[in-house]
Amino acid sequence: GKKCSCDPLNGYAEIQVKTCTLDISFKPVFKSHMSVDGGIYYTYGPFLLALKIDENCSVDTKEKRQTADFPAYNIYPASPWNYAVSGWEAPEIIMNESSEKPMWSYVPFEIKIKARVLENWELVRIKRAEKEFENGEGIDEKQVECGASVVDEDNLVTPKIPSADFVKENLGEEREITLVPYGCTNIRLTVFPKYFIK
């Protein structure tokens, strides 16, 4: 094979070849994007990225619907997650090799960027019972036949993206963080608060 030039039109390049074996390589680009709520999220080629967070995982003993074969888990962050970014970070891209097949147990690449700790931006506890169906019990008859019960939720969730003033007042030290493909995470922080560079 030989290299040839092409002029992409609207992001597409037409390649005409005779019958042959062909490998095509595309170089993914690391990009930051502004979310509708004013935060920043990142992509690398077709991959949406999320913060790599250590996990504290335990079986939820209060969940009545779990079985030994299909347990319910509580998964909480075991490493810092409260970071703000500028959207102008220079990435360090690390490609990971694996001989595993299937390859689901490893992260194919990691991207390291600089971020700032955002003090006082903490998880929020939401406690509620589902009451969404007409019978007022939160479940319908078919679900009862299958053994369902009212869902009592007691969740820790990521708070909304804070205001620019909150970010400015609570901006902490700079640290290196690691981004990985969204699908390689169980706990997901994808949209980061934005801080402005002076």
Give the positions of each predicted feature:
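C-terminal beta-rich recognition modules with glycine/proline-rich loops and embedded aromatic residues
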Residues: 26-198
